[in-house]
């Protein structure tokens, strides 16, 4: 009889913990935009020019490019399933993000820009966010696919959906938080049967924000463990470069401040990356052309030392505003083989300071604009002064 009651109690616990939770409230919100774009030319060449012939390629005429004009749209739908007053499931989807009447993108596997879905999925419907929020007496917990790479000001931000878990505590004007998550997973799994051990990229974040009546200031530390390139050359070159590849560890430190000083609105932020890229395996078997093709200088360990800075000020003079912006992003010195001063940090995809250069909207909808001798305009600001 005792065994019967024990089995019955066990079955009851299993049912209790596996029961579905019904939402007591569902909230919808979202945004829709439709826009048009016109370019008088689809590259940044002022005049046509000729690329001289080489021993292997004929001469090529590069003109200014044709003009283009088109319309595009996107519906972004946010849904909150409120299970209880302290428990919420949040989902976000982008619907029909496409140019009107344009060809559809072929199905693929690579995620779209700032999306958890592919470009072809975004042209139909792609879910980017899905996470649960639990507000407890000791703080708030979040787990699932959430927005990451966003901190402080718009400078340096790229709103990327990533799987992560976080804890947040607010006391007075101070908010503290810790997070951990995954940028990339290349370890062996059902979708990657040829993956290697511990071949992924993870991050661990701790931050604090203090707010007052006329502003706020914050400080964030983000440790990144990047093992994506472990055995990268060994898997391509075989025994010649057995297990050859590299990993890198980096710590990003970024303080920011926003303040209103009378008629002056001031904001500033700094990003500093410090770390090391370490080689492993039989690096002597990697030929120089293979290194060059991967954009690498050598097989010696490299120190990461990169800096970006941003300051913006606006003065309210009543009838009009006066202001200015300054930004700096360090670039890599090709003569320092043991140090990388640029290439990781950038201005971010959320920061679009110009209509043509460093404008993610232009790049996403019109593509990269070709320049002189194979160069092109597109992507985030890197290796630059801006003002």
For the regions a language model picked out, list residue spans one by one.
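Internal, well-ordered domain-core segments that constitute the primary functional module
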Residues: 140-220, 224-231
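Charge-patterned, long linear interaction tracts outside catalytic cores
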Residues: 223, 227-245, 250
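Positively charged n-region of N-terminal signal peptides that target proteins for export
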Residues: 1-4
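A surface-exposed, glycine/aromatic-enriched loop/edge motif typical of exported proteins
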Residues: 332-362
């Amino acid at each position: 009889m005792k065994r019967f009651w024990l089995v019955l109690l066990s079955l009851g616990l299993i049912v209790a913990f596996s029961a579905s939770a019904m939402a007591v409230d569902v909230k919808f919100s979202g945004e829709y935009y439709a826009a048009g774009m016109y370019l008088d030319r689809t590259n940044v060449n002022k005049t046509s020019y000729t690329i001289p012939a080489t021993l292997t390629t004929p001469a090529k005429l590069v003109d200014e490019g044709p003009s283009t004009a088109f319309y595009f749209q996107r519906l972004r739908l946010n849904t909150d399933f409120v299970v209880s007053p302290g428990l919420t499931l949040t989902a976000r989807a982008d619907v029909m993000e496409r140019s009107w009447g344009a060809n559809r993108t072929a199905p693929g596997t690579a995620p779209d820009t700032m999306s958890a879905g592919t470009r072809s999925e975004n042209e139909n419907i792609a879910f980017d966010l899905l996470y649960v929020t639990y507000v407890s007496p000791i703080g708030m917990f979040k787990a699932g696919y959430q927005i990451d790479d966003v901190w402080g000001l718009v400078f340096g931000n790229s709103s990327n959906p990533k799987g992560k878990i976080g804890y947040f505590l607010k006391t007075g004007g101070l908010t503290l938080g810790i997070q951990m998550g995954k940028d990339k997973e290349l370890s062996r799994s059902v979708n990657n049967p040829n993956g290697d051990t511990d071949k992924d990229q993870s991050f661990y974040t701790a931050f604090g924000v203090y707010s007052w009546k006329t502003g706020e200031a914050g400080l964030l530390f983000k440790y990144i463990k990047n093992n994506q390139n472990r055995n990268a050359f060994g898997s391509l070159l075989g025994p010649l470069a057995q297990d050859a590849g590299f990993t890198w560890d980096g710590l990003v430190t970024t303080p920011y401040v926003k303040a209103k000083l009378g008629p002056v609105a001031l904001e500033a932020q700094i990003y500093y990356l410090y770390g090391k890229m370490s080689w492993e395996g039989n690096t002597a078997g990697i030929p120089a052309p293979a290194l060059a093709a991967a954009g690498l200088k050598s097989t010696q360990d490299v120190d990461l030392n990169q800096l970006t800075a941003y300051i913006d000020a606006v003065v309210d003079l009543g009838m009009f505003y006066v202001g200015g912006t300054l930004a700096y992003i360090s670039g890599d010195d090709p003569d320092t083989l043991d140090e990388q001063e640029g290439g990781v940090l950038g201005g971010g995809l959320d920061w679009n300071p110009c209509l043509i250069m460093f404008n993610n909207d232009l790049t996403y909808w019109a593509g990269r604009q070709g320049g002189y001798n194979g160069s092109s305009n597109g992507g985030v600001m890197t290796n630059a002064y801006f003002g």
